[in-house]
Amino acid sequence: MITSETVYHFVGIKGSGMSALALVLNDLGYQVQGSDIDQYTFTQRDLEKADIKILPFSADNLHEGLTVIAGNAFQDDQIEIKTALEMGLPVVRYHQFLGELLKNYTSIGVAGAHGKTSTSGLLAHVLSGVAKTSFLVGDGTGKGIKDAQFFAFEADEYRRHFLAYSPDYLIMTNIDFDHPDYYTGIEDVFDAFQSEAYKVQKGIFAWGDDPELRKLKSNAPIYYYGTKSNDDFQARNIQRTVEGSEFDAYYHDENIGHYHVPLYGEHNVLNSLAVIAVSYLEKIDGREVVRELADFKGVKRRFTEKKVADVTIIDDYAHHPSEIKATLDAARQKYPDRQIVAVFQPHTFTRTIALMDDFAASLNLADEVFLTDIFSSAREKSGKVSSADLGAKITKGGRVLKLDNMSPLLDFEQPVVVFMGAGDVQKYEYAYEELLSNLSPKDN
């Protein structure tokens, strides 16, 4: 039960989902604080703007009157969680708490191996523009409105955590093999999504080209979206330009509108179509959906752009072969005449080993590829693979960059440099930006 008679203490408050949930509760008027590592993270700014107290990890943070919300990155032996359990304080996991909170709203989740954050951010933006909407997005963005009609949220499949949710609607962007430290293969991933499908109340929106999603069964209706004639919701007459993407949306043979989105890549056409489908079934005015889609600015760490000197730098969270392919496709659409240089930080040893050939194939879609050392997770500090092993399979380069020497990236003229990864790849990006800013102008 969620109550105002306690202070909610978030262990790992800087995590993307945790920070978003903390912001939601704070907006709803509950007392919120949290703890985490000292290192600055991109989620921290919004917490600070909301005056939410962030403490360093310490058992001294725990006292009577707290309810502990434990981040899923931490086990029960983490010092604060362990202390809270010993003190008899209520301890609830992030996904369990969110599952309880969602019961108060018409909840619309977004699940999938890839595209969750981009789609949930787009969904939250559109719904917020037309109705009172609370939302929780995986880029650390969260908003709570007490009398909201909708709650848009990201539903993470890792360790089957999304089984804590019984949403009214669920968008399923795809099923793919990821998280090899937990899932044994694609069949195991499908089993998780199938279990969640039975928990959906009103309707599922699933990408029609995904063979795994086509096998789903549910007590709720399943609406497929895509570009094929057998999809319930279809995007037709797609035009992808340097200004973004536009298309006509159809529900069966009914034209429900012409839409423009300032987004790039085929995946963003599909993400937009899924949001249109939800809006259509909830009888939201189509003209308002057109307006909101055209005004979307994107989410954090998803194709985030900046210009330094004559270089365009793109920062993206892509850390799976399918995501890399989508990000590079988007870069090609927006910059068809520029050289695309990829800088990829492999994320975890298990994922790098399990998907190495697929990583190489996706990265080869760039004009030139650089790698950083593998980013290890808290669950695995070492492994029997290196970035050089991946680099050996890449035909478009594959050199390993070191943080203290980013100069190999200077060999390109007016490039689009795409930094990708789910770890701390941004430190390489910042080092490159500093190098560029320190360069003297060329002599005439």
From Swiss-Prot:
Question: Species name for this entry?
Answer: Latilactobacillus sakei subsp. sakei (strain 23K)
* Gene Ontology CC annotation, any one: cytoplasm
Pathway involvement of the protein, from the record: Cell wall biogenesis; peptidoglycan biosynthesis
- In Gene Ontology terms, what is a biological process of this protein? regulation of cell shape
Q: Where does ATP bind?
A: G112, A113, H114, G115, K116, T117, S118
Grouped into one coarse class, the protein's main location is cytoplasm
Q: InterPro entries attached here?
A: Mur-like_cat_sf, Mur_ligase_C, Mur_ligase_C_dom_sf, Mur_ligase_cen, Mur_ligase_N, MurCDEF_pg_biosynth, UDP-N-AcMur_Ala_ligase_MurC
**Could you cite one Gene Ontology molecular function of this protein?**
UDP-N-acetylmuramate-L-alanine ligase activity
Q: Does the keyword Nucleotide-binding apply?
A: yes
Question: What subcellular compartments does it reside in?
Answer: Cytoplasm
Q: Which UniProt keywords apply?
A: ATP-binding, Cell cycle, Cell division, Cell shape, Cell wall biogenesis/degradation, Cytoplasm, Ligase, Nucleotide-binding, Peptidoglycan synthesis
This chain's protein is named UDP-N-acetylmuramate--L-alanine ligase
